[in-house]
């Protein structure tokens, strides 16, 4: 089925074209215009042509005498045309500066001068094709909705056809605006026109509105801004106005009316204009200074407060705290080891936090202790555990206190032996356990006490005439190899022995000293050589391996820390 349109009455009716032009003008100025168009768009000529559109029925949903609803396929290739007039900006630099913020664009003197040129555009050769939903009712008029974009092509003729760039630009911009017009604005325009033709009430309302517009005077104040003046009014020069000056002003007076602005708003606008240098409203203004966008007073105060001399630096505070906590942890670890000798413990050291506390002399630092704890159960008396606890606490107290350089040397130090002692595995293996292995561990794990040679050199030069206690090699020999385990000692090893250390083995100054530094170094070397030879003779003795190799015993079991 096809429709036959009676197109001639639409062409002959002049009032219809006038009304359609007004509606198209309002629709074109409603949407946001591109910045190149600086004037209003006016429809000066509209002609629908002599060729009607073609409609193909796809679906009919409702059919009656006063109403109709259906879906159609529309195609139009006719001779309709439309003529528009407006004003455009011919200077592209002016258009660029208008669309950019002032603080991010240059400010030329004459190159940015606006140049407005009138423009006339004629749209013709429309080609439309799309699906239309058409609803007709005598009470509600015609409702037409496009399901897709119907515009295929059109021809744009303008004043700038001789300039290819401007012609192509206008072609693209107008096509984009017309696509929006067909989808959004054209259905509303057609609906209003249909109401004017078929609805008598709407027609009477339109006539009444036109009469009211004609009778309404066009001159006179529409809204008097002087009825409610601002709180702190100023004129265009910034001078504060009194209430009497405001009362004397009126819109009908012949005198020039001053522009009334609020002083607070002017200050805010001035601050906002000056703040374009730093993007902050509270940056102080300093001449001949390059501002940075992120330099604000709040950030400067916060950054300076961290490094102020009132509060100590963060790293030093952590170091002091870490040193205190490390001492407490070590003390608790020592007491825990003395109370629970059947479980392995670890000493946690605050390495990252105690860096500041380790900047002093090495004499203040406590030597790290390595202990091998027996995991096997053995009978322990309360007296033994008490003695171990007392020995550990005294050791920690004496080693944690910082000795002075002028203090006297200590002759006896009650200290828990640092040497790893392997307890007996069983009564049977106690008699067959080789003594050479334990003796070697004892001799290798013990070292000579350190000596402060630099302090002795200064002391020898300062006091060459005072007698010096000769270095006793027996002390060193006893220190290195005097502790020799026996089967009786392995069965009940002493937990807190008292060792006699010579005064020469400590790094403290002596009251009397004789001899030279060369003799002292020679004695130290001689003592070390004697101790090394004694250790080698004990290791290489033939009777030491007889017990181990003669009975064909199995291999030595792993240390108690790893074997179960």
Swiss-Prot record:
Q: What is known of its domains?
A: Lacks alpha-helical transmembrane segments, suggesting that it resides in the membrane via beta-sheet conformations similar to those predicted for other outer membrane proteins and porin. The SMP-LTD domain is a barrel-like domain that can bind various types of glycerophospholipids in its interior and mediate their transfer between two adjacent bilayers.
Question: Compositionally biased, Polar residues: which spans?
Answer: 297-322, 329-352, 396-408
Q: How does it sit in the membrane?
A: Multi-pass membrane protein
CC per GO annotation: ERMES complex
Signal sequence residues: none
Tell me where in or outside the cell this protein is found: Mitochondrion outer membrane
Assembly behavior: Component of the ER-mitochondria encounter structure (ERMES) or MDM complex, composed of mmm1, mdm10, mdm12 and mdm34.
Protein name listed in UniProt: Mitochondrial distribution and morphology protein 34-1
Instruction: Specify residue ranges for compositional bias: Basic residues.
Output: 359-371
Extract the PANTHER family matched here: MITOCHONDRIAL DISTRIBUTION AND MORPHOLOGY PROTEIN 34 (PTHR28185:SF1)
Q: What is the species of this protein?
A: Penicillium rubens (strain ATCC 28089 / DSM 1075 / NRRL 1951 / Wisconsin 54-1255)
SMP-LTD domain residues are: 1-195
Record field: compositional bias (Basic and acidic residues): 452-466
Identify the keywords attached in UniProt to this record, alphabetized. Answer: Lipid transport, Lipid-binding, Membrane, Mitochondrion, Mitochondrion outer membrane, Transmembrane, Transmembrane beta strand, Transport
A single Gene Ontology MF term assigned here is: lipid binding
| Protein family (similarity comment) | Belongs to the MDM34 family.
Region Disordered, as annotated, extends over 297-408, 414-433, 452-473
Query: Which InterPro entries did the record assign?
Result: Mdm34, SMP_LBD
This molecule's function is given as:
Component of the ERMES/MDM complex, which serves as a molecular tether to connect the endoplasmic reticulum (ER) and mitochondria. Components of this complex are involved in the control of mitochondrial shape and protein biogenesis, and function in nonvesicular lipid trafficking between the ER and mitochondria. Mdm34 is required for the interaction of the ER-resident membrane protein mmm1 and the outer mitochondrial membrane-resident beta-barrel protein mdm10.
